[in-house]
Amino acid sequence: MAQLMEGEISLNQPDSGNLARTRFYVCPACGNILFSTGGASVFCCGRKLEPLSPLPRENGPAIMIEQIDGEYFITADHPMEKGHFLSFAAYVKNEQIFFTRLYPEQNPSFRFPLFPGGTLFLYCTQHGLTRYPNIR
């Protein structure tokens, strides 16, 4: 912050546009969800946010994937209580990101377009981000 106040700006490297390097951020104060496709200084509620470090799928909730009408219908085995729920699901494939916000007391199921081979991310408010690569 001092550098910014003194007129010094540190520039990031140009974004290569590779969505496989997408980083997710969640504000601990307000729950705001942000993402970047490259290196970024992300702030919310006056705090600098660090990118979430995804856990491997073995550490996350079990998921069931069905192919229905040209889409993935995904259900997660996870509680959806006010203090412990899945906050979002994101599916990243090539140059596209599909994002669904989830809420407490809602069913933990969602749909994404059928693009095999992408990566699914689920964010739990208590346990963090889980990465599920190579969805088929």
Residue ranges of model-derived segments:
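Residues immediately within or flanking Cys/His clusters that coordinate Zn2+
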Residues: 24, 41, 121
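Cysteine-rich micro-motifs
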Residues: 38-49
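Short metal-binding segments enriched for Cys and/or His
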Residues: 49-63
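Short, flexible, mixed-charge glycine/proline-rich loop motifs
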Residues: 15-21, 33-37, 115
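Exposed aromatic-hydrophobic patches
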Residues: 73-77, 107-115
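Cys/His-rich microdomains that often coordinate metals
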Residues: 33-34, 48-49, 128
